[in-house]
């Protein structure tokens, strides 16, 4: 039987690829465009772009506003986009990404989603040099002390997160009272929101440095859906001595980039974050 050629040898239909440049330009701009501007964005002459737009319009991938002549994405493009979003499983899409991160960074990567009791691990990719941290599928991260918990707290509604934080705060206060020390007490929700959560939003990452397990640090990045809601967190975990936890470090940049790419695949645009 004849084997299929590798991707780089497969022949395509060039006219479809050229038309795709116009669709890419419309999707990137996110608004209807005049022919001249659309052609320039796609890197082609206006006359050539017009011919392709006529064909794309006939199949519903673009449509022209008769009142101003601008071109936008058509009903078929909308239908395809909605179907793509319905088929996009965040956990499935993120699994190979987290495995690649574990190999590239040399650290364990956890995937957490928001569950009934808070951020819950649903996938783990062990590092090549595994660290001994008691984590497994179903482990629930705290809101106050973990990178994943702080991340979800920064982006979810207060009504979802605050009750869990207050429960942790009461538990910490009780432990501190029994030990005769105030060292384990947590700040008020207002203080937590104005300091930690504000920083998490500004940096685009959650971070913990030895607060849960001594000598272990973590960075966590959010993956958003098309509504701007955090559907999961990618969290890199490793020994504090080896994990670069700087906001501007190479690991932070790599993690942000991976999470942003996943968010884009789920239909998220940076301007979609709720106020």
Question: What label would you give each PLM region?
Answer:
Residues 1-91, 260, 264-268:
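N-terminal helix-turn-helix
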Residues 16, 66, 114, 225-226:
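Short, acidic, Ser/Thr-enriched surface-loop or helix-capping motifs
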Residues 27, 149, 153-157, 252, ...:
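Short amphipathic alpha-helical signal-transduction/dimerization elements
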Residues 61, 121, 232-233:
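Short glycine-/small-residue motifs
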Residues 67-170, 174:
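Amphipathic alpha-helical effector-binding/dimerization core
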Residues 163-180, 256-275:
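Cysteine/selenocysteine-centered motifs that mediate thiol-based redox chemistry or coordinate metal-sulfur cofactors
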Residues 182-258, 274-275:
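Extended hydrophobic
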């Amino acid at each position: 039987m004849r084997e299929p050629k590798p991707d780089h040898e497969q022949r395509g239909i060039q006219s479809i690829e050229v038309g795709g440049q116009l669709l890419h330009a419309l999707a990137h701009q996110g608004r209807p465009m005049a022919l001249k501007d659309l052609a320039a964005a796609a890197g082609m002459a206006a006359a050539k772009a017009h011919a392709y737009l006529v064909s794309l319009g006939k199949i519903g991938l673009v449509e022209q506003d008769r009142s101003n002549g601008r071109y936008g994405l058509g009903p078929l493009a909308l239908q395809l986009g909605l179907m793509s979003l319905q088929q996009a499983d965040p956990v499935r899409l993120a699994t190979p990404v987290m495995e690649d991160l574990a190999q590239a960074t040399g650290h364990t990567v956890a995937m957490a989603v928001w569950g009934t009791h808070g951020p819950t691990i649903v996938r783990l990719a062990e590092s090549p040099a595994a660290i001994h941290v008691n984590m497994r599928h179903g482990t629930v991260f705290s809101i106050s002390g973990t990178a994943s918990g702080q991340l979800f707290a920064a982006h979810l509604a207060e009504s979802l997160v605050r009750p869990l934080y207050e429960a942790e705060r009461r538990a910490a206060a009780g432990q501190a009272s029994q030990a005769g020390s105030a060292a384990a007490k947590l700040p008020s929700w207002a203080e937590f929101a104005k300091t930690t959560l504000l920083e998490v939003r500004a940096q685009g990452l959650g971070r913990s440095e030895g607060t849960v397990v001594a000598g272990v640090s973590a960075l966590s990045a959010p993956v958003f859906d098309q509504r701007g809601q955090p559907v999961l967190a990618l969290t890199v975990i490793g020994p504090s001595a080896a994990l670069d936890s700087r906001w501007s470090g190479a690991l932070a940049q790599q993690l942000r980039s991976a999470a942003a790419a996943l968010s884009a695949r789920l239909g998220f645009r940076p301007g979609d974050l709720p106020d």
